[in-house]
Structures are given as structure tokens and as C-alpha cells.
Amino acid sequence: MLLKNIKISNDYNIFMIIASRKPSLKDIYKIIKVSKFDEPADLIIEDASYIDIYTKRISSGNIAIASGRIAYIGDEMPLKNNDTRIIKNDFLIAPGYIEGHAHPFQIYNPVTFNEIMIRHGTSMVISDDLPIYIKMGLKNIKRFMRFMGRLPVKNFWSVRLDSQSMIDMEKFSYIKIKELLNDDYVLQAGEITGWPYIINMEKNMLKNIYNSQFLGKRIETHNPGASKNTLNRMAAAGITSDHEAITGEDVKTRLSLGYHVFLRYSSIRKDLKDELKYIIDEKLPLNRLMLTNDGSPYYNDYMGMDDLIKIAISTGLNPFDAYSMASLNPAVYYNIDGIYGGIAPGRLADMNFIRDLYNPEPVFLMLDGKIIDKEVKLDPPDWKGYGMLYKNRNIDINKINFNGSDETLFMRNQVIMDLNKYKMEDSMEIHLITKDLKRIVSSNIHGMGQFDALASSYNIEGSYIVIGSSHDLMKKALKEVIKNGGIVFNGNKNIRIELKILGIMSDKHSDDVRNITEEFRSTMRGSGYKFDDPVYSMLFLNSINLPYYRITSSGIVEVKTRKIIKKPVSLKI
């Protein structure tokens, strides 16, 4: 490989000049002049072999780049001078991958999540805004979106229209959501977890959906196990995509109703291979299918978009179709294929240099026409300046009483909970303290294992949850979590996961996050946790978009009916 005048950079500050990726008129003039061979290119990849995602073949030619965009592809040699950087190599070039459905706040934070994405060749991410919007407010989240827009990965957002919990719905008023939807960094509304609001024609939800359509934004729903009638009604309301197909038949139903479908492969959902086999056997069209990885920290490091492409190819999918599902298809879905999703003139110069068609893992990346190290470490923002640091709180923990309960929340899997009316053997106590520290909900839980204490501020509501068998250690762990945020585990091993950012995210780099969450996972499983991913289990304990029962700030709730089975009790702290 020859890289002339090329510096492989691990400094993302080189990208600050192209924060919005909107070319100036001067840039457009330059790009056209380079394409006409009237002006030298900034960079030329000579004799490149690249994946032509549009015609589904490997093509070759010289690629000229100017102002961060591809200006020319073809057999002729573009104009160059002493300042033109030259790349000659034997790698195959693939388009930058797109993660179209991301949750960048699962212990890692959005910046460290970007580090992980780069490692796997993903150069554009469309992320859920839910927890940071609820905790930061409108002004700060808009500022934070602009900071994220200055990172090498292109960061866009999907704006939630409901809270996914029994609280905070007042924050999703039409006026507030309208301002967010108008932002240039927002491409979509959703995911919509509160789909009954649509079916029941709740006014605020329908106004937000109407405005999303008016602004040309996509609208994504969350409908696992939904009937065809429900999916019909959601599509009639304007829904454009869903990520919760569980079987190949689910995929077919969604496609038949006009949906775009995200095919998911994550630590809690490994349906992708079976879905793809069905899709191939049924000869379903592929142009409305996209790949997504929705995993927890330890999982994301091992299963990125490059791995999903590899899985798709190994299942029997045409390799070019697999790459399209990770690049062109999501670009078309989000109406950005004029600037992204493939290697062609006018597109941003985001590319992965890979060894061959069957190995999508990047050896190195090009982002905005600049070669960078795929192990790049990104500088964090001023978390305090964005209002994102957890605010320390002190309480008299002895004023909290853990009263016993008869019923048991038992875990069918790592995210689905049912309810028994009696206390089950091998269950432990679980208590939720509301984030205002004014109420407590108490029950038992089965499936988490057996240990002394586990306290956490890491959940959808931002409330405080403590589980265990030792009241003294439970109070000690809870006091620490209320004071500093994070996860505290006391059992056969003591673990402390600091979550200094809003009480749900670590300020550590991605490697550190992976190591501590792997240790937590291993320790939980060694303590009898029955499933694979305790991080997800903790996150979703009070999330009302999952069956069948949840422990929430409003009490123990039957999800389907929203009926309060057990009410909270007042605290006097």
C-alpha cells in the first residue's frame, strides 16, 4: 500500500471545519472544477477497486476527492499537484456503513459509542434521543446535537414522541417536539413505543405525527408481535418503518403494508439468520430492508455493522445486497442518498478499505476524505456545560423502609416480565424509589439471581432501583447510587460502575466501558442471573413498551391495560 502525503490521524479535531457537511458555494465550485479536471483534487485514489452499490458489481477507476466529497470516478487521471494526496493500494473499497437505529446511551455515551462505530466501519448513525431529551431539556439537547455533528461520524437523530414510561409525557407536547423536528440534525420521529396513543387517536400524538409528515421526516414504530390489523392502522397513520419483526413472516407482513424494515441482530434478539433464510426462500424484495445492531456495551464491540454484513452473506444473501442493506438502503430510507450511501460523485467521501468482498471489516477508514485510525479516541464534550453531569444527592437512608410483598415479578427472559400473586422461591426483594425521592414501590423479583444488593440509577425512568436479600447492604448500595449515580453490586464480588453522565452513562472510553460491563455480566451470571444481558434487564425494568408487567414510579403496572396493580407508598426523607 502506498499513501503519499497521507497522515493516518487519530485526532478528530481535523473534522471541525466540516461540522454540518453542507458544502458552501465555494466548495461546490471546487468539486465541479475538479470533476472537469480544471483544478487539482485534494486526494486521489489511483486504480481503485470499489463496490458499486448501484449496479451491484465491483468496479475500478480513479477516485478524485475535493472538499470532503467525491468529485470524479473514472478511467481518466484527475488533475493533481504537489499538495494532492495519493492513495494506491490493493484493498477493496466499500461505502461507509450506516447504523439507522441506535441507542447511544447504554452505559457508553454517544461519544464513546461513536468510537465503537468507527471500529466497525460505521460512518453514519441515526440515534434515539429519549433519555438525553428527558434529562437535558430542549435547549441543551439542541446544543448537544451540534457538538455531535462535529464528530467524524455523521450523527443524526430520531426524535421520540412518547416517553416509554408512565411519567414525563408532558415533555412531548406538540410545541416542544415541533421545534426539535425542525432541527437539521433530525431525520426521523420515533421510535414510537406508545402505539396505543395512535390507535386511540390521542390528539397530541397525532399532531406530532402530522407535523413529522409535513416536515418530510420518517416515522418509526416499535411493534413486536403486532397483528396485521394493528400494523395496518399504524401505516394508515403515517408510520414508515419498524424494527421489531421477529420472524420472516413478520418481515413479509410489514413489507406488504409498505413499511421499511430494520432487521435486528443484538444481544437480546438474534433473529437475523432465520429472517434472512425466509427472505431468500420467499424471494422477497430487498430494497426496503436494513440492518441494525442494538446491543449492549460488551456486545457492540464484538458485533458491529461489518459483522452483520458478514452474517447476511454467510446466510446466503448476495454480498452486494448485504452491503446495500448497510449503506444505500438506509440512505434511501432517510432521503439522504444524494449525499450518502454509495461511492459516486457528489457523495461524502466516507469509505471502508476492506480486504475482500466477503470480509467487511475495515482495515482503515476514510471519513470526509481523510484517512483515520479505526481505533481513534474521541475527545469528550464539556459534560457539565451541557447540563449532563449527574447531580449529587444526599439522603438519610435510614428513613427508607423496605417492606415485604406477596407478589413476584418473574422474568420470562431478560426483558419480559410476568407477575405471580405469591412470593416465589429463589426470589429477591425489589424496590423502586421515584426520582423525586417521594415514593417507593416494593415487590419481589425472580430471575435476577441471588446476591446481597444491587442498586442502580440506570433505567428508562431515571428512578432508583435496588434489588437484593440484605437490607443493610441494599441501603448502603442505594445511598451510594442516589448520591453519585451508577450501578453498585455487592455479592460474591463487589462492582461499582460509575455513571457520571445523567446517572445512565459512563464518561470512560469504550474499552473501559466494555471491560467493566463484561465483569458485571460475568458476576451476575455467576450469582444466578438466568439470562445473557443484565444491562438490558436493568434498563427495561420500568419500560412500559415491553410485556407484561413493569415496576414503575406509578406502581406495578400491567402493560397492556396500563392498570396499576400496586400503588407506590409515600416516603418522608
Swiss-Prot record:
Catalytic activity: adenine + H2O + H(+) = hypoxanthine + NH4(+)
UniProt GO MF annotations: adenine deaminase activity
Superkingdom of the source species: Archaea
Annotated TM spans: none
The protein's enzyme class: hydrolase
EC number annotated for this UniProt entry: 3.5.4.2
Keyword set, alphabetical order: Hydrolase
Keyword GTP-binding listed: no
The keyword DNA-binding is assigned to this record: no
InterPro entries: Adenine_deam_C, Amidohydro-rel, Metal-dep_hydrolase_composite, Metal_Hydrolase
Family the entry assigns: Belongs to the metallo-dependent hydrolases superfamily. Adenine deaminase family.
Name the UniProt record assigns to this protein: Putative adenine deaminase PTO1085
Taxonomic source organism: Picrophilus torridus (strain ATCC 700027 / DSM 9790 / JCM 10055 / NBRC 100828 / KAW 2/3)
